[in-house]
Design a protein with these regions (language model features):
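Membrane-interface helix-loop junctions at the exits of transmembrane helices
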Residues: 55-59, 186-187, 246, 252
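Hydrophobic alpha-helical segments of integral membrane proteins
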Residues: 17-22, 27, 55, 95, ...
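Juxtamembrane boundary at the C-terminal end of a transmembrane helix
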Residues: 241-258
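Long, contiguous internal "core" modules enriched in hydrophobic/ aromatic residues
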Residues: 3, 10-12, 31, 38, ...
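Hydrophobic/aromatic-lined pockets within catalytic cores
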Residues: 26, 162, 249
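Membrane helical hairpin/interfacial module
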Residues: 15, 19-86, 90
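Short, strongly hydrophobic alpha-helical membrane anchors
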Residues: 1-4, 258
Length: 258
């Protein structure tokens, strides 16, 4: 699948943005310690770097990334590239002022900027795919699923790194919205591309089954106080795999409208 690097780039990027957001909000609400926030920011930065490296495989040559920046302001893809770069830059600056230079004010400002540009980056992604020539993508469901990854995958990662209340809330809200809108999404695709959408049933089924299982697993683990990093890590991995499966289905829907 030629778009596989984009699958990882978008899902991991949205997951990292969600993790930054939920961790920072948890810290401000007194639900996360300074040390936990520091570890979470490191993890989120690593995830975003992995996303960029894998996404770069789709571009091919690294210098092509800079060519993409020439269309900033008029090209959604250029805007996405720019915002991803700014997102990573502020993430790096946050760690710089937290771990090395240790300036609390600058660290705080960079952390806020990281959250803001993470959200801007997530916003820019569906702008690339909401194009009239691809009827299967030209829908509000394209935008919706990108934001839901931020909630469910970002929420799962947030639970793993200590932001359990907001993480669980984000995962729950995102999962409910996914289940509530899936029938309408499939109905829409039944009109725009019935054959190609039918071929994605396996990917969507895997996604929904995993999310459904996690809706039972997370309450059981958190209610009983079983905060084993191994178990929560496996849960987060399962959720990310579910979102990757759903994103593969999304990219498989590509077809030019005649």
């Amino acid at each position: 699948m030629h778009e596989l690097p984009l699958v990882f780039f978008t899902v991991l990027g949205q997951s990292a943005a969600g993790l930054y957001l939920l961790a920072y909000a948890s810290r401000k609400l007194g639900m996360l310690s300074e040390n936990q926030l520091r570890h979470t920011n490191i993890a989120a930065f690593v995830i975003m770097i992995i996303a960029l490296v894998i996404g770069g495989l789709h571009v091919g040559q690294p210098l092509r990334f800079f060519n993409m920046l020439l269309g900033v302001g008029r090209s959604p893809m250029s805007n996405e590239a720019l915002l991803s770069g700014i997102f990573v830059a502020f993430g790096a600056a946050t760690l710089l002022f937290t771990l090395l230079i240790k300036n609390k004010v600058l660290s705080e400002l960079c952390n806020i900027a990281t959250v803001i540009f993470g959200l801007a980056f997530v916003w820019s992604i569906p702008q690339v795919y909401n194009i009239a020539t691809v009827a299967n993508w030209f829908t509000v469901f394209t935008t919706l699923q990108m934001w839901m990854t931020l909630l469910v995958a970002g929420g799962a990662l947030a639970i793993l790194f200590g932001s359990q209340r907001l993480g669980a809330m984000a995962f729950l809200i995102g999962s409910i919205i996914i289940f509530a809108t899936r029938a309408a999404y499939v109905s829409f695709l039944g009109e725009t591309g019935p054959e190609i959408s039918a071929e994605q049933a396996g990917f969507w089924s895997f996604q929904l089954v995993v999310l459904a299982v996690m809706l039972f697993v997370y309450p059981a683990l958190l209610y009983r106080g079983r905060n084993s990093s191994v178990l929560l890590g496996l849960c987060a991995l399962a959720v990310i795999l579910a979102e990757l499966s759903g994103r593969i289905a999304f990219y498989n829907l590509w077809q030019i409208t005649m």
